């Protein structure tokens, strides 16, 4: 098979299967020591106790024998440390309603924070760990994370407009949602959610970075200005927006692969567009075995399993779209991100019509350009506030209609977003107004 056929089988063929409209939710949370640097022993102890309390089975261990991933066979829920022992992730197994997700999430976080509080630590709802300057920058010492660390550190060597935070994954946290999608709905869904991305920046910004004070959400900056962003097709938006499944296939065939496995070892290399990669005889890369070693290998069609993009909206190999751009939210409002996407998923035609006819797209540019503007701390000096409030309220009302049609009373999770729309506020803006990080950490940790 050629690269296009391989892409089709990996990403498009799963869309043809019958969909059950499940919801997938992943929430990363910074582990914060209110007294200073995070204590790894405190974090791993809380992880171990939660694993035992909820009947999870240890699944992955680091090079020192410390468990960094555990799974519940009954629910499919996963506890893990994401990139570092400062970043805890709860990946909820497939659920049919947000109430199921909320109940399990609250149980897990409530138990873990009760343990952490005894050592003045907490999980909190921030997109950037406030102690990132003093915390341990080391990645989890495991094969996959050793590979990722080596790759991201290449920002020090390769040419590019890279930021200096190669370890951004160790201190940045996101709230990600996966929803089933069909082949027929794929392009329309990508278009609708691409158009609404600028408004998500207004509602969900929660990753303030003092080194970039002009940004309320540093997520785009972290990903796009890292080695992941060498090929624009691996990050950001689908540009131009695809109109057919064939265009999606062509687009993904030009996304870059940067890692694979050989002989049980992860290899990484300078990113290569997949359609070019398969035509190469050999590729030079590196692997970790006590230290990083140079190597060369021959590309194989099976390496498609390692092709991964980090876009605002990603098409996965499981027949889902993953929405990646939202920062972790205050934990008492954790379901707002999933509720927003779930409610709009069945309203894509209406959403497209609403946004295309709005002042936002009549007066401005592409979704990417408008999101950049909406991400700025000085945004309100360049945008008509009343028009923006009205548009946000219209989009949220459409979302509420979509949730009501589901019939599970899930629209209750939108209440914080309606409040944010009224004031054009976000968790980042609240943080800046408060100017008391310990108070914000405690407030955003409350369930």
List the predicted regions and their residue ranges.
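C-terminal accessory/tail domains of diverse enzymes
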Residues: 1-89, 93-94, 168, 184-191, ...
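The substrate-binding groove and active-site-proximal loops of carbohydrate-active enzymes
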Residues: 91-102, 178-180
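Hydrophobic alpha-helical hairpins/lids featuring a short glycine-rich hinge
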Residues: 105-119
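Carboxylate/His-rich catalytic cores and anion/metal-binding grooves
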Residues: 116-132
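Short, well-ordered, mixed-charge alpha-helical segments that flank or form enzyme active sites
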Residues: 130-137, 185-186
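Short, low-order "capping/linker" segments at domain edges
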Residues: 135-150, 219-230
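Acidic, His- and aromatic-enriched active-site or binding-groove loops in soluble protein domains
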Residues: 141-166
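Short, conserved phosphate-binding/catalytic loop or strand-edge motifs used
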Residues: 169-175
